[in-house]
Amino acid sequence: MAKKKAFTPLFYLSFIVFLPWWISFSFKKCLESWITNWWNTGQSEIFLNDIQEKSILEKFIELEEFVFLDEMIKEYSETHPQEFRIGIHKETIQFIKIQNEGHIHTILHFSTNLICFVILSGYSIWGNENLVILNSWSREFLYNLSDTVKVFSILLLTDLCIGFHSPHGWELMIGSIYQDFGFGYNDQILSGLVSTFPVILDTILKYWIFRYLNRVSPSLVVIYHSMND
């Protein structure tokens, strides 16, 4: 009976961890062909935000300048104007294909993320009993740890998330999430999120240490400040 109680929260925890990945992988395989066919046949208008439209226009201008320079080097611009127009046409078609693939992947990622969120939300509501068991199991596991191990875990987590080297990790994670939902890459927005989000987490952590840990385990706070200093 005790083994069954211990197995239930572990199974539920592994289910929560691996379920989003499995759902995302499955729906991507199922929806990719349908979204590709819908975009290439039924989509008559391209919906872009201002950042994406500006980025595509800049890339197209760079492409045109690159082809023009390449033809000038080959001395085709004066002697073979027809080849120059054909080269522009081919490169433009290739550029449009790349942009279409980008839009298809954006729609695919957004759809799978939305489906994962809905399924996990429904499972967390319907599996409330398992969530309570997981919560009680987590509390019991944490309470059985020594104060030194708890403080070490807190310091390790804070250094990973809000340490001096953490902005690089936050930049990669926020950038991938930002583009995964269909937003164009923007250095100003990304820099703003990277510079403010860790600060907010640091403030929340310090408030939690001051209010919760100081009330539950004052010795833990003393050890934390000693190791932190």
UniProtKB/Swiss-Prot annotation:
InterPro entries with a match to the protein in the record: CemA
Record keywords: Antiport, Chloroplast, Hydrogen ion transport, Ion transport, Membrane, Plastid, Plastid inner membrane, Potassium, Potassium transport, Transmembrane, Transmembrane helix, Transport
Membrane-crossing residue ranges in chain numbering: 7-27, 114-134, 189-209
Subcellular compartments: Plastid, Chloroplast inner membrane
Example of a GO biological process term: potassium ion transport
Key word NAD present: no
MF (Gene Ontology): antiporter activity; proton transmembrane transporter activity
Function description: Contributes to K(+)/H(+) antiport activity by supporting proton efflux to control proton extrusion and homeostasis in chloroplasts in a light-dependent manner to modulate photosynthesis. Prevents excessive induction of non-photochemical quenching (NPQ) under continuous-light conditions. Indirectly promotes efficient inorganic carbon uptake into chloroplasts.
HAMAP family associated with the record: CemA_PxcA (MF_01308)
Name of the protein this chain belongs to: Potassium/proton antiporter CemA
Top-level taxonomy: Eukaryota, Viridiplantae, Streptophyta, Embryophyta, Tracheophyta
Gene (name only): cemA
